[in-house]
Amino acid sequence: AREDGENGDIPISEIEKQYDFLMAHGGPFNIQLSGGEPTMRDDLPEIIHMGRKKGFTFFQLNTNGIRLAREDGYARKLKKAGLNTVFLQFDGVTDQVYETLRGQAMMELKKKAILNCSEAELGIALVPVIAPGVNDMQVGDILKFGLDHMPFVRGVHFQPISYFGRCSQKRPTNPITIPKMLRLIEEQTEGLMKIEDFAGGGAENPYCSFHASYLRKGERELKLLEKKSGKGCCCTTSDDSRQYVENQWSYSTKNYDEVEMTQ
């Protein structure tokens, strides 16, 4: 929906044309459903199912999790339609963080969304927006929460806050940079995850993101998965890359102890 209240949703017939265009120009691709808030569309399951019938094999939903938490059976409905994974807005582990960033207490709602997704066997990635002085002291707690909720939580995707668009906060003198984010991870996990564990992005400029993958060996022990040159989420071929993403973010009991941390 648009900010002026007018319904600006793309008709499902137009989405079908977009699917056909993608399939004709190199598909099948991995499909990411974003917004706004995609779950505001009642026909979201039909959109996913239609894409599946056309041959697309991976669907990712970016969501605040409100409908997933409040509507009984909704997660299972999306799973049945063909959804693989949910990238869940998850800014922290206390209500105060959500009251500051989202205007309301949401921690119990987030837990309920995760429970419903896990029961539907949907993979989950936690997606925190990190803001200085708001939740940068909860980086370690977010990672611990993710580890405690495996195998359904497949990873954590940190996004330092950007000061443009609808963001009402003024740019501080100490913004969250990639080097600072890495230091926070190492310090707040007490060295469980180290700065040197992480590598730059492969498809984009390596200074724009970082990632590391681990195997959980016990309650407080992780094994860093070795990164090979040219591998990771951006592999040597597009088919390999798409398959890597599907395997990494979809729920699978085979990969119970594998988790990825990215920014």
State the predicted function of each range.
Residues 26, 30-31, 60, 84-86, ...:
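Conserved C-terminal portion of the radical SAM core fold
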Residues 37-39, 65-67, 92-94, 130-132, ...:
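Active-site-proximal loop/turn and secondary-structure-junction residues that shape catalytic pockets
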Residues 23-24, 52, 79, 147-149:
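Non-catalytic positions within long, well-ordered alpha-helices that form the structural scaffold/packing
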Residues 214-263:
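Radical SAM enzyme core and accessory elements
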Residues 2-5, 94-100, 166-169:
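A short acidic, helix-capping loop that chelates divalent metal ions and anchors anionic groups
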